[in-house]
Amino acid sequence: MKVERRTIEYIPNEERHGKAKDLFPVWFGANMHITTLVTGTIPVAMGLNLFWSVAAIICGTLIGAIFMASHSAQGPQLGIPQMIQSRAQFGVIGAILPLFLVMFIYLGFFASSTILAAGTLSSFVPIPGSWSIIGLSAVCFLLTIFGHDLIHKMQKILSWTSFAVFFAATILIFQLPIPAGSWIPGAIDLPIFLVAVSAVATWQLAYAPYVADYSRYLPVKTPASKTFWYSYAGTSVSSIWMMLLGALLTTSLPDFTANSGSQIVQLFGPFSFIMLIIVLFGQMAINVFNLYGAFMSTTTTLEPFLKLKVTPKVRIIMILGVTLVGTVLSLLGQSNFMELFLNFIFFISYFLIPWTAINLVDYYFVRHGKYQVKAMFDVNGPYGKVNWITTIAFVLSILLEIPFINTSFYIGPLAKMFGGGDIAWIIGLAVPSVLYYVLMKPRLKKRAGYQEKLSSL
């Protein structure tokens, strides 16, 4: 296995390979781990019964995956990482604003997945949790060095092996006793249901900043519809499956979230070592995703200032740097995981949703997929240093979300007025979409008209 040569630059046609169907196992495997499963416990932890928890999981996944897969479809056409493409909206320097937020997301998910894996490992092997975190992080660091192709291969292996093992786990979990009436709809607590849908949708949206990184090597003529549907199907099927198991386990085992990995491994009795291997492999596989994304974002952030040439040595140093930061976060967060994880999920949604709205409106409705890829690497090019229209729309959208926020550390006044319902995600989608389209479309038309006049002289 060779170390990946490319980083944030355009992938030339002669290096393109693979088919759209290869994306199904990538995104199916990306969710076949216990962090996804723990996300499925959130609706139950909020107070919904099993029926409404499953409904929230299905609704949130199917809605969130639309945005995730729409980003994936950009990869083959542009041949660059997702966050480089953000320079077309924010400007070459301005894109650093969402990049910082995205790096926080990668490292946050790295920490949460590492904590879960370390807790599971330490339950079966006499190793302190902190040393488990350090050891697992080291393995992820080594795997991330190889890059794109190894990640694809790991996800294919994980897809098949985890399918077989979690199929058996599903049979065992459905045999566990659950409280009477858990599947009866009953009255819906709409505010809590909306919060749960938002949390689940955020799981899918969290893939948006790097989903195109794994489709950018596909041939440029790959149909966008195939890229979309293979990504959508892969992530939706596995997410709903894992989150359903999480909701069932929380309903059956009230203390499940105290050590989720250990409890699901113990279901296999004398064959628990098989499940232990799958759990650890799944956590490491998704953490390679997270480290790769953090590395790409770091490179994208530094490139306008340093004009980096990412040699193998530079690559290793940068990946080591993000691994160390993620490891420190894991060590600091292991004592109060569930509360931190829940707040983290909600926190990132308030920033991710406006970004994804702007990016998709620009790609599909403003520029219609037509970009000057070389110009995205030129600070003095047509995309400029900072696009103030985008920056203002992005920041204003976040500010307008605040009154609608409902978290454990802050409840906005309008969220209280609506009985605790968190509709900040609706504001985060609608406001930047309208603002960006209304302000940016005329500006581009005016620029195009001016260029036509120049060319006719």
From Swiss-Prot:
The chain crosses the membrane at residues 24-44, 50-70, 90-110, 127-147, 164-184, 192-212, 228-248, 264-284, 316-336, 341-361, 392-412, 420-440. It is found in: Cell membrane. GO terms for cellular component: plasma membrane. Gene3D superfamilies: Hydantoin permease. It is a multi-pass membrane protein. It comes from the Bacteria. This is Putative purine-cytosine permease YxlA. Keywords: Cell membrane, Membrane, Transmembrane, Transmembrane helix, Transport. One of its GO terms (molecular function) is transmembrane transporter activity. It comes from Bacillus subtilis (strain 168).
